[in-house]
Design a protein with these regions (language model features):
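Conserved, mostly hydrophobic/aromatic
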Residues: 17, 41, 63, 95, ...
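Short, glycine- and charge-enriched coil/turn segments that flank and shape catalytic ligand pockets
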Residues: 30-32, 119-122, 168, 208, ...
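Active-site loop/helix belt of alpha/beta enzymes
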Residues: 134-276, 342, 368
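Active-site-proximal loop/turn and secondary-structure-junction residues that shape catalytic pockets
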Residues: 40-44, 65-66, 86, 107-109, ...
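Charged (often Lys/Glu-rich) extended helix/loop segments that serve as interaction or gating elements
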Residues: 2, 242, 253-378
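A charged N-terminal "starter" segment
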Residues: 1-125, 168-173, 203, 207-210, ...
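General structural feature for long, well-ordered alpha-helical segments within catalytic domains
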Residues: 13-16, 20, 24, 44, ...
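Hydrophobic residues within beta-strands of alpha/beta enzymes
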Residues: 59-60, 80, 103, 177, ...
Length: 378
């Protein structure tokens, strides 16, 4: 489905979003101690956030701005987890004033800042410690977050001393452990490795007589960018069953998940129009009116998105040609796909760039003084 609106624009399938949310609920329905938080950073469109909050998910926020957006969209403050390696004092204060559920703390220095802010406001701060589990993940280097060389989290050997240090912080309450090893993960072995590492750390806590009420395993579940119509809903069954089978929770513990891409990616399509088909000596270029200012993932990560010529499909064109699909931005990296096989493409054709619901609209920019893309719902 497309709309008679100026391009480029994002088109969101709210029906698919609801089916995705229903699939998540189906997997955790028998586990009252399982809690899913939606990662606001994946897509902060207000209409999407309102639908997700109405479905009962919590929110995973990484900035004060995201906390504000989450609250305005109906997420209960108590269901908000505030992560991020660099929290400013004003963000910490706003989170405390809002009464969020927990901070996911990434360093002893941050812990001290939270205690100072909470003490000055005479408000309690519930904190989980983000531990770097040194677990590699099968994903792009830019979105792997759980290795020893990454900037995120507290080293494993520092876990117990940092927890003990909280005893001297009157405004801080230790509420659990937080982990996140990466994004766009499709190999369940990655999550199993995380479970085994958490089990090891829990045994260490047991020996020290420390109980972590909450275990937050982050997110990271990937989606099928190649054939979105074949797998419109991610493999939540395998994802959740990995934790059910491999993670050894203690009695009374709650398990938290932070899902973003897997919730919203497939519901979004970037619709663009062909400005020109440029025929060079070695290449044919399809030049769109959308660029990396509208969808930066291909330029930033080398990410793949399925691309379809909607007009050619409607007109039932049969000839297939090879094109480089590019944007109008004055940068050589403004490429959506090289050597794309498309039905014969002409000036004015509508092009769909699929699986663009996550890290698409939310990462758009006004570089080259270009307007931000519009968004519509179907």
């Amino acid at each position: 489905m497309t709309l008679d609106h100026p391009t480029p624009y994002y088109l969101y399938d709210t029906g698919l979003l609801q089916r995705t949310l229903d699939a998540i609920h189906a997997e955790i329905a028998d586990h009252d101690n399982y809690h899913v938080h939606y990662a606001i950073k994946a897509n902060a469109n207000p209409g999407i956030l309102q639908q997700i909050s109405a479905a009962g998910l919590g929110a995973d926020c990484v900035s004060g701005g995201e906390i504000e957006v989450a609250l305005r969209s109906g997420f209960p403050a108590a269901a908000i987890a505030f992560a991020g390696v660099g929290k400013a004092d004003w963000e910490i204060r706003r989170a405390l004033e809002a009464g969020i559920g927990m901070f996911n703390v990434e360093s002893i220095e941050e812990l001290e800042a939270i205690n100072d802010c909470a003490t000055s406001l005479n408000l309690p701060a519930r904190v989980s410690l983000r531990i770097n589990p040194n677990v590699g993940a099968h994903t792009h280097d830019h979105i792997a977050t759980g290795r020893i060389e990454d900037k995120f989290g507290i080293d494993m050997e520092d876990m117990v001393p940092v927890i003990c240090s909280i005893q001297s912080m009157p405004a801080v309450e230790f509420t659990g452990l937080h982990f996140h090893i990466g994004s766009q993960l499709l190999v369940m072995d990655d999550f199993e490795a995380l479970c085994l590492r958490i089990n090891e750390l829990q045994e260490q806590l047991d020996r020290e007589g420390i109980f972590a009420p909450n275990i937050n395993v982050g997110g990271g579940l990937g989606i099928d960018y190649d054939t979105p119509d074949v797998h419109p809903i991610p493999d939540f069954a395998s994802y959740f069953s990995t934790f059910k089978q491999s993670l050894l929770l203690r009695p009374g513990q709650h398990l938290h998940f932070e899902l973003g891409r897997s919730v919203v990616a497939q519901m979004g399509t970037l619709v663009a129009r062909v400005l020109y088909v440029k025929r060079g000596k070695q290449k044919q270029f399809v030049i769109l009116d959308a660029g990396f200012t509208d969808l930066i993932r291909p330029a930033f990560y080398g990410a793949h998105h399925a691309i379809e010529n909607l007009t050619a499909a409607k007109e039932q064109r049969t000839q297939t040609e090879t094109y480089d699909v590019v944007g109008p931005i004055c940068e050589s990296s403004d490429i959506f796909q090289k050597n794309a096989l498309l039905k014969e493409t002409r000036r004015g054709d509508l092009i769909a760039i699929r699986s663009a619901g996550a890290y698409g609209e939310v990462m758009a920019s006004t570089y080259n003084c270009r307007p931000l893309p519009a968004a519509y719902f179907a």
